[in-house]
Amino acid sequence: MEISVFSIQKSSRDNFENEIQEYIKMSAKFAKINDKIIFNEKIARAQSSGRSDALRAYDEIYEPNLKGFCVMLDENGSQLDSQEFAQILNSNSQINFFIGGAYGLSQNLKDKAQKVVSLSKMTMAHKVAKLVLFEQIFRGLCINANHPYHK
């Protein structure tokens, strides 16, 4: 199984990133996990230009990666409990999660996904959402392996 998380953000080495790397390391016994951070000058310029330019730039970056089972994170997506989330992981050998940039994700991109998921009804910083996603990936893998992490 291979799981990739794509995010549009500037690279940083902070405590959030350290925790994410820890979850990747712990998950490695169950699946290959990839953290794909994407940010370039084109995205920076597009975000400065406004919402429509930014969403178009996100589409250009993400569309070539729409392979396997694709899950978009969006505040209006389905809310799942950890067991339901684990079923997504259990049912697919290649899973790609996509976290939007400052302007979220375009409807076009969400329409191409197999699943659109919300981590919470609350708004949270992208780095917090990403950390929560990696924890839920680890938890889901543990549920599927009958590992005691999920109690």
Curated annotation (Swiss-Prot):
Residues annotated for S-adenosyl-L-methionine binding in this entry: L73, G100, L119, S120, K121, M122, T123, M124
Subcellular location: Cytoplasm
GO molecular function: rRNA (pseudouridine-N3-)-methyltransferase activity
Pfam families, per the entry: SPOUT_MTase
Alphabetic keyword roster: Cytoplasm, Methyltransferase, rRNA processing, S-adenosyl-L-methionine, Transferase
InterPro entries per the UniProt record, alphabetical: Alpha/beta_knot_MTases, RlmH-like, tRNA_m1G_MTases_N
Main subcellular localisation: cytoplasm
The EC number(s) this enzyme carries: 2.1.1.177
GO cellular component labels: cytoplasm
Record text on subunit structure and interactions: Homodimer.
Official protein name in the record: Ribosomal RNA large subunit methyltransferase H
